[in-house]
């Protein structure tokens, strides 16, 4: 009975892909169309991180996020009082999610070694980081990566004993000392 249920679930999931899988397929097809329309047309095997960056910049023309230029009087204001002529661009979160889906799609089609995945290129990661920082500054909400606080560490040092764990027998014990950081 359980096997039938699992088989039905697998069949239904294979007949109608999840929202994520559908979006991933649409994104992949859009990227392949971009490569075909590129001058000169590009083959996926020759695609590099630089081509991915061109694609991301191409997508900016379809963006809906106002990104104030540094010369704009509203630069750094989270809620500007009126309209300006600054460009609309793709939001960083959208680009980040897109790259994640395209990276997964590339791996699924067997695009080669993970090192050859153009969506995982260092230049793409750097570009996304710059977009995130630029958009945060333009909105007046600077993105500061939270630094991990060093936890108060206790160090444990064993004290030699006879190895017997019975109470009061002089067995091995741990002495905990608080480490101080200066």
UniProtKB/Swiss-Prot annotation:
Pfam family for this entry, one: ALOG_dom
Record motif Nuclear localization signal, residues: 145-149
Record key words, sorted: Developmental protein, DNA-binding, Nucleus, Transcription, Transcription regulation
PROSITE patterns: ALOG
Disordered: annotated span: 1-22, 138-168
Compartment(s): Nucleus
Domain ALOG: 19-147
Keyword RNA-binding attributed: no
One GO cellular component, as annotated: nucleus
Coiled-coil blocks: none
Sample GO molecular function, one term: DNA binding
Functional description taken from the UniProt entry: Probable transcription regulator that acts as a developmental regulator by promoting cell growth in response to light.
Protein name from the UniProt record: Protein LIGHT-DEPENDENT SHORT HYPOCOTYLS 5
Organism listed in the record: Arabidopsis thaliana (Mouse-ear cress)
């Amino acid at each position: 009975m359980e096997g039938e249920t699992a088989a039905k679930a697998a069949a239904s999931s294979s007949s109608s892909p999840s929202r994520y899988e559908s979006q991933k397929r649409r994104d992949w097809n859009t990227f392949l169309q971009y490569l075909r329309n590129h001058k000169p047309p590009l083959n996926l095997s020759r695609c590099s991180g630089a081509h991915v960056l061109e694609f991301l910049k191409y997508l900016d023309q379809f963006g809906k996020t106002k990104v104030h230029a540094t010369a704009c009087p509203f630069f750094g204001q989270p809620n500007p009082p009126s309209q300006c002529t600054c460009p609309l661009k793709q939001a960083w979160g959208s680009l980040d999610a897109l790259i994640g889906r395209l990276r997964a799609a590339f791996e699924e089609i067997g695009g080669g070694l993970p090192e050859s995945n153009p969506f995982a290129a260092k230049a793409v990661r750097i570009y996304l980081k710059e977009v995130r920082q630029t958009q945060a500054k333009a909105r007046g909400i600077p993105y500061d990566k939270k630094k991990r606080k060093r936890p108060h560490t206790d160090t444990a040092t064993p004290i030699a004993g006879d190895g017997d764990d019975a109470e009061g027998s002089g067995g091995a014990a741990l002495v905990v000392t608080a480490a101080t950081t200066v």
